[in-house]
Swiss-Prot record:
Organism phylogeny: Bacteria, Bacillati, Cyanobacteriota, Cyanophyceae, Gloeobacterales
Quaternary data: The glycine cleavage system is composed of four proteins: P, T, L and H.
Function: The glycine cleavage system catalyzes the degradation of glycine. The H protein shuttles the methylamine group of glycine from the P protein to the T protein.
GO biological process: glycine decarboxylation via glycine cleavage system
Xref: HAMAP family: GcvH
Organism: Gloeobacter violaceus (strain ATCC 29082 / PCC 7421)
Superkingdom of the source species: Bacteria
InterPro entries attached to this UniProt entry: 2-oxoA_DH_lipoyl-BS, Biotin_lipoyl, GCV_H, GCV_H/Fam206, GCV_H_sub, Single_hybrid_motif
Name of the protein in question: Glycine cleavage system H protein
The keyword Cytoplasm is annotated on this UniProt entry: no
Pfam assignment, any one: GCV_H
Domain Lipoyl-binding: 24-106
The entry's keywords: Lipoyl
Length: 129
């Protein structure tokens, strides 16, 4: 898969992306993370209605190479979990920015939550040098 970094998204050092939709944010893993992990075979995510706090583990992603904890990039309430990706984790690898998203979160405080993100160009420079 080609490494892509859609311009409309925000990116984090943890190789997660954020798609901001008002006070709701879609969280997923970047194509760079997918490339590093290899074939994804299992994902564990929180339940709808769970509260997540920035920096805390909210799940894990398992590939043929490793098991990685997923750390919350922001604080808020989980509005939706991508159950299709839970049932078919390979979807995260084949379409990370589309059908392979992980969770949707309502931000606890939108003004405070999005300050530590990078643009697509900044992220590309970070991971590709």
């Amino acid at each position: 898969m080609a490494l892509e970094y859609p311009e409309e998204l925000k990116y984090l050092d943890s190789h997660e992306y954020l798609r901001v939709e008002g006070d709701t944010v879609v969280v997923g893993v970047t194509s760079y993370a997918v490339d590093q992990l290899g074939d994804i075979v299992f994902v564990s995510l929180p339940e709808e209605g769970d509260r997540i706090n920035r920096g805390d583990s909210f799940g894990s992603i398992e590939s043929v190479k490793a098991v990685e904890e997923l750390y919350a990039p922001l604080s808020g309430t989980v509005l939706s979990v991508n159950t299709v990706a839970v049932e078919d984790p390979a979807l995260i690898g084949s379409d990370p920015y589309g059908d392979g998203w992980l969770i949707k979160v309502r931000l606890a405080d939108p003004a405070d939550e999005l300050g530590e993100t990078m643009t697509a160009e900044e992220y590309r420079e970070r991971v590709e040098g």
